[in-house]
Amino acid sequence: MRILQLSQQFPFPEIDGGKIGIANIYKELAKKGSEVTLLYYNDTIIDQKIKKEAENYGNLIEIKHSIKNTKFRILKSIFDNKPIYLRKHFSNSLFKNVLSQIKNKKFDIIHADHSAMAELAINLKKILNIPIGLRLHNIEWKIWYRYAEELQSGFKYKYIIRQARLLKKFEEELIKQFDVLFPITNIDLEYLKNLDPKLNLVMASAGVDVEKVKPIKIEKNPFELIIATTYRWIHNINGLIWFIEKVLPILKKEIPQIKLTLIGKDIPDSLRKFQSKNVDAIGFVDSIIPYLSRASIYISPLFVGAGIRIKILEAMAMELPVVSTSIGAEGIPATENDGLLIANNEYEFKEQILKLIKNQNLRIQYGKNARNFIINNFTWDISVSKIYESYKKLLK
């Protein structure tokens, strides 16, 4: 099976949830015997060693293109009847460039990751006349709506709510044109069923490489909280600022030695300014395994988002109990006994974290339960097998 996979970014190294999802689909499809060509947008310099490693699984086609929300793009979008999220991912000139890059190449299936790549996939189908599939890592318009709800008023609110409404309209129309759709949560699955009962839907959730992501023997810090995330997304930053300003002070009153470790590339100054004995903004690390092995609790104070937080799944695979908002934990059908504890305000975060810190046996048991939950429900082999088998059916 010759698969053209469309991605809005080069997904290596696998340093954030978005990249992890795309990279593992690419690798797992190749492992199942497919000839995969990964076509991606990029405007940065890629480490050639990392690129060579990616080429061990398939072919790479780079399209020089930036998807940054520049001031010029944002200004133009104020008067545009197409949402900026889709406008920046597709244009006629971009399409012509893609066609020139795949000229004389043969494909059986087009696989698109994220609705950002939906328009490109649909237009390629018109030329290549082959089936198209879309993996919905999230329902994008929901994220914009939740952001608007958080803002509530002002010019920024008016801009975001308009973009959300436009995106909902466009995204729903694009979704209906695919031969198969792969939602990653039950919430998204039900939404799509209600959108159009005739849609071909196959649940294919996120996953974890449980052989690679597992704890190592290292001394635990019973007072250490940790989060690993991408700081390119403003909602992750806002959630952490809220946690540091609202939750950490009340935790420090009871446990002065409490410590929050921040892992991830490009930590902004708005978070680095909190560096202290209680906040350690480490930044990018080659391997997150030692840090997750040392910490005792993973946190996810996210108030805007959709889809699944892959970093939460990885933390659970590392035998870490997780304290998260309902939105942060969305799409993960785990209970408290499975190691996923819900907290939606500062007092709930405080209570859940203190409960785990003060009861070592409970914390350890929740951690073991969390890993078992991931092994039984969230592996890449399970998820990508569903995608692979769905494509085989389309080609019969």
Question: For the regions a protein language model found, what residue spans apply to each?
Answer:
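Short hydrophobic beta-strand element within catalytic cores of glycosyltransferases
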Residues: K311-E314, P321-T325
